[in-house]
């Protein structure tokens, strides 16, 4: 069935703009482009569903900062909305992800996110490979946060502090898409 559908899909693609076909894209973060003063790595995944040039998706990213033998993980999730256009075998997608959640995992402190706002802007480029599509993209994160850190000291007292700040970093993504009607 797959072999028989390829010529039909190619005929349909010749009649339509490549951005007007429905597709599902899954991407993973492949590198971090920021935070020069800190040792940091990032990991993340993104899934998008695009129909008639409009997309909706979900992206999560974990930034791990290695600061003097303490690894702090900062995880953010966003709801993506995007638009897509294309020419011949290439597609271009741009969008913004609204922050759904932001939390920290600290080895020495209990953490509670008091407030967070922001999100991430992104763009992706796709290359048509028939039924599949190879994608690459760039995402810029910008999050304002207020995180409460607390721990019990050796004397039994609880030590708390608020960490207010702006988290900004950039990631590169690679992925694969599946095109259908």
What do these predicted regions represent?
Residues 27-41, 59-77, 100-117, 144-167:
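Flexible, solvent-exposed loop segments that connect beta-strands
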Residues 1-15:
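Classical Sec-dependent N-terminal signal peptides that target proteins to the secretory pathway
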């Amino acid at each position: 069935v797959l072999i028989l559908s390829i010529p039909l899909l190619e005929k349909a693609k010749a009649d339509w703009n490549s951005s007007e076909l429905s597709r599902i894209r899954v991407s993973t973060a492949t590198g971090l482009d920021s935070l020069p003063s800190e040792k940091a790595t990032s990991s993340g995944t993104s899934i998008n569903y695009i129909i008639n040039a409009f997309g909706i998706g979900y992206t999560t990213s974990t930034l791990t900062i290695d600061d003097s033998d303490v690894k702090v993980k900062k995880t953010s999730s966003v709801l993506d909305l995007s638009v897509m256009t294309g020419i011949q075998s290439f597609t271009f997608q741009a969008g913004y992800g609204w922050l759904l959640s932001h939390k920290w995992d600290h080895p020495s402190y209990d953490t509670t996110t008091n407030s967070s706002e922001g999100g991430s802007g992104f763009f992706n480029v796709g290359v048509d490979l028939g039924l599949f599509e190879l994608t690459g993209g760039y995402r810029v994160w910008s999050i304002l946060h207020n995180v409460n850190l607390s721990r019990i000291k050796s004397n039994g007292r609880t030590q708390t502090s608020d960490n207010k700040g702006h988290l900004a970093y950039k990631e590169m993504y690679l992925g694969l898409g599946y095109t259908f009607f």
